[in-house]
């Protein structure tokens, strides 16, 4: 648990190594996929966002990937954090890529992510924690 964390999309450990939410890149390289909901509705006001991305990359293959973190209702998302570098994030055993952003998030906010990659339909596992 992250100190001061209010809520997360992580539901505990998983036998298949997945954490958080799977986000899929577009079917064509360098195109964004659809928005995936990370948190449907934040339960309280938050002062920051921790983001951890894993599951991107395999040996001897380019796994460059960019991710947008957005807020807003389904179909009306607004990019909050653009082009976050998440490629080569490795497995959950490695630290993957972990970020903290000091952002004010209102109660009731939907938080989502989408990504684009040099590999069509590549995936990433995204964990998010809202901090007090």
Give the residues covered by each predicted segment.
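Beta-strand-centric surfaces of beta-sandwich/beta-rich domains
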Residues: 1-132
């Amino acid at each position: 648990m992250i100190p001061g964390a209010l809520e997360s999309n992580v539901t505990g450990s998983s036998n298949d190594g997945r954490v958080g939410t799977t986000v899929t890149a577009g079917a064509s390289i360098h195109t964004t996929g659809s928005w995936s909901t990370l948190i449907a509705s934040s339960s309280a006001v938050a002062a920051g966002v921790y983001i951890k991305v894993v599951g991107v990359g395999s040996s001897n293959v380019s796994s460059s990937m960019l991710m947008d973190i957005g807020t807003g209702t389904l179909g009306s998302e607004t990019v909050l954090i653009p082009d976050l570098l998440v490629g080569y994030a490795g497995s959950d055993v490695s630290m993957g890529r972990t970020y903290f952003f000091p952002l004010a998030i209102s109660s009731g906010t939907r938080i989502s992510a989408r990504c684009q990659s040099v590999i069509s339909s590549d995936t990433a596992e995204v964990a998010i924690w809202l901090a007090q």
